[in-house]
Curated annotation (Swiss-Prot):
This is Na(+)/H(+) antiporter subunit E1. The gene is mnhE1. Na(+) extrusion is completely inhibited by the H(+) conductor carbonyl cyanide m-chlorophenylhydrazone (CCCP). One of its GO terms (biological process) is sodium ion transport. PANTHER family: NA(+)/H(+) ANTIPORTER SUBUNIT E1, NA(+)_H(+) ANTIPORTER SUBUNIT E1. Keywords: Antiport, Cell membrane, Hydrogen ion transport, Ion transport, Membrane, Sodium, Sodium transport, Transmembrane, Transmembrane helix, Transport. GO terms for molecular function: antiporter activity; monoatomic cation transmembrane transporter activity. The lineage of its organism: Bacteria, Bacillati, Bacillota, Bacilli, Bacillales.
């Protein structure tokens, strides 16, 4: 991915020199030409086409922000209405992720979401230990992590 992105920038800068016009519009045009050229050559360049990876990373950020906003409202409800019966507790989340960086990313995303904290990962890296501010919604929490965060982290890590 990095090789393709650097090549695209080199092509864009080369385009500026060839056209002898150093404007932002001309750079964008050169970048688009470079993008087309890199796409045509992506089978011989290492890694998958970098635009796909960038799209998946942007998708990960958007999904995380949505989950973050939802979790903030859930915690806000608990703070505003202390009469709500929440049951803090611990649970084990079973993950299918294999790469260490994916497990770390998922753990960080879970920890950054208000109301949940990752306590650790098992030695075999198949279980993540989580503390939730409301344990009564464990099934919903597990389903939310599985269908949104873990799914997109897996997509970002695909080759």
């Amino acid at each position: 991915m990095a090789v393709q992105l650097v090549l695209n920038f080199i092509i864009a800068v080369f385009w500026l020199f060839v056209t002898n016009s150093y404007t932002t519009n001309n750079f964008v045009l050169g970048f688009i030409f470079g993008l087309v050229l890199v796409y045509l050559l992506h089978r011989v360049l290492p890694g998958r086409f970098y635009v796909i990876t960038l799209y998946r990373i942007i998708k990960l950020v958007i999904i995380f922000l949505i989950e973050l906003i939802k979790a903030n409202f859930d915690v806000l409800k608990i703070i505003i209405k202390p009469s709500i019966k929440n049951e803090p507790g611990f649970f084990v989340y079973h993950t299918d992720l294999k790469k260490d960086w994916q497990i770390v990313l998922l753990s960080n995303l879970i920890t950054l979401t208000p109301g949940t904290v990752v306590l650790g990962v098992s030695d075999d890296r198949t279980k993540i230990y989580i503390h939730a501010i409301d344990f009564s919604t464990k099934e919903q929490e597990v389903e939310s992590i599985k269908t949104s965060l873990e799914k997109i982290v897996r997509e970002v890590g695909e080759i």
